[in-house]
Amino acid sequence: MLTNEQAKENLKKYGPNELEEGKKKSVFQIFLEQFKDFLVIILIISAVISGFLGDVESAIVIFVVITMNAILGTVQTVKAEQSLNSLKQLSAPDAKVVRDGQLMQVPAIEVTVGDEVIVEAGDLIPADGKLLTVASLKVDESALTGESLPVEKSLDEVPEGAALGDQTNRVFSGSFVTYGRASYEVTEVGMSTEVGKIAGLLKNASEKQTPLQKNLDDFGKKLSITILVFCGILFAISVIRGESIVNAFLFAVALAVAAIPEALSSIVTIVLSFGTQKMAKEHAIIRKLQAVEGLGSVSIICSDKTGTLTQNKMTVENYYVNGESVCSGEIDLKDPAQRELLMFSMLCNDSTNQNGQEIGDPTETALINLGSLLGEDYAQVREEYPRLSEVPFDSDRKLMSTEHFIDGRYVMVVKGAVDVLLERMSHIQDGDTLRKITEEDRVRIEVQNKHFSENGLRVLAFAFKTMEQEQGLTLNDENDLTFLGLISMMDPPRVESKDAVAECIKAGIKPIMITGDHKVTAAAIAKRIGILENMSEACEGAVIEDMTDEELQEFVPNISVYARVSPEHKIRIVRAWQERGNIVAMTGDGVNDAPALKQADIGVAMGITGSEVAKDAAAMVLTDDNFATIVKAVENGRNIYQNIKNAIQFLLSGNFAAILAVLYASLASLPVPFAPVHLLFINLLTDSLPAIALGLEPHNPEVMKEKPRAMGESILTKPFLTSIGVEGLCIGIMTMTAFMIGYRDGNAVLASTMAFGTLCSSRLVHGFNCKANKPIIFTKRFWNNIYLIGAFVLGCLLITGVLMIPALQGMFKVQTLTVAQLMTVYGLALLNLPVIQLLKWIRTRKK
């Protein structure tokens, strides 16, 4: 016990009782990171060269686009962190300590080494320590060990080096008192606690780039090299044709600006940003922007059991009474034996429900919750039949007894382990009568108990004994008992878990359960929700302890359930799947999940029950702690990736058309079809709006019928490049057709005007072609994107304004078109739609 002064000194010496956070990046650092993209670097170089050579307009436009993109990325990153911070709260906001001989409440962060802390049912343990006094203390350490059932604590010494879950004379930060009360002396705080040690493991787990980051980096380098080659060819052709070196270089740079989709980075960021906002509304907060797509790419989900796949709440499954097993949903309170078993289970019970908060051992709260579901108020039952005396539960005899006055007689109610109670039975309740218990009765009870246990159920036996008079119960009274029945219970799966697992399997994702709980219990849950088919797919962590990394890589495909695992096991399992070429997601809520969350490609933490360490390690936080939210996130991720691909296809096919048109004009010794201002107009207006709209395409549930993309698969696949080439060729042909029509009389300005109008209009129309890889012109899906329709209408108005308004004609170096010429421009642009839709139909038929 400390004095206040000693507590202050120790607080200075050992530091505050909190976990250290990694060094936070400043907003300016986050802003600078937005400029690391290879495409952005190329554009900056182009802008500098353009400005140096006099094309200040192009340089300004490029810098504005890049800066806007960087600001948007910074805002989204900061917003995501702020959303997560709103979830954060201290593991134990306050703690009761004894200082200067007085009990006082202090912030958990001020608890220090040497403090005497008082805890009781409902309290969180604020720091690690050794027990001083104990009164039937049980502690839920599931967040630390993965064990779903509370651990009974005592003052008995334990062997040095005992496993964490076996240190029954100590309590650990972040644990939860479910029953009893105790006092303990604090021995470790902050990063020195067991929670802190696990947090330290995170430093050894490297962070991974998401698939989108890898693909876009690869894509940007290949695209830039290709475009620079094209620009070099154009520069050489221009010089050979007699153009001055300066003019040839300026146009090559202008073409580079037009060909490199500088809007790409900002469009990808905008699409991901909208994706994160949509997912936040669906209870998923994204901490790392590109994780939106990354989650949709996973092929393995390693999930914790307790609180993630299950409810983290014990519920009654079955009654065994009068020789029959009855499901909890079929309990009939008109049956005297069933009603008596329910009543006795609420009387021989210390748990309570205070303002909706369950206080007590989970197995006991499950019993009073069942009573509530059946219309029986435990408080009224206890008031009607008050407890006269008791023999509290202890782990040695594994029994609890209470005495009550019921219907004119004194009754002792006993509950406990089946094997212990059977030894003390002399009679059995058989319908309305009592009779002596037979060996056959005992065998039936043992068989039923074994059946329940093999299905992962926790079993309690109940018995009673009529007393001659009120007396203080003693241990000697717990004999000559009458067997009443068994009650089985378990931490059941979440309602949504089975469907969520089935959806994952349909999508080609293998769900794996990794837990610190017992193998039988874990396997029972896994079978219920579809993760496990037979017991050969389940193993305990000890099995992989001595395996080499290579042996583990060969072993993991055969296992769907891992039980009794340590944090180090989890990291090894995740890494083994990654070494096999899989993209791995790890879901969980406990401190023990955090290292694997960090090691995984995508870490998914629980927002309500999740520990602070787990949230900090994760890429995504589920605010509803619902496993089914992950399935929606997978669908969102896949759709967002597809939408980004559609936007890229739209941008590159249009850019390819412009390149083909310019190259054709150069090779055919024709005038240059576009002025630099034309290309800037196309990039900023007729490209960006439809591309963003394509990124916001309504989600297509069909993506969940596809298998995950192969790890390392580039965006620039052969079919993707072929589509870009063919579609770009079609648009290029229409553009140069318009150019040649306008150039019949040798009017280069008219030819350039018609080519510019056709290219702009064609790209607007082409947005509808890029909605899907198959023809959709005659389906509802063709019209389901209001953003794309809006971009098309706005783009048409802008083009028409440039072509028809005299003040804009001079600025954009175009001339007035006749009605016939205008119809020719729009007609050629619209022709792209049926032509490309027909090509998609032919390609689909071939598949």
Predicted stretch roles:
Residues 744-748:
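Membrane-helix interface and helix-disruption motif detector
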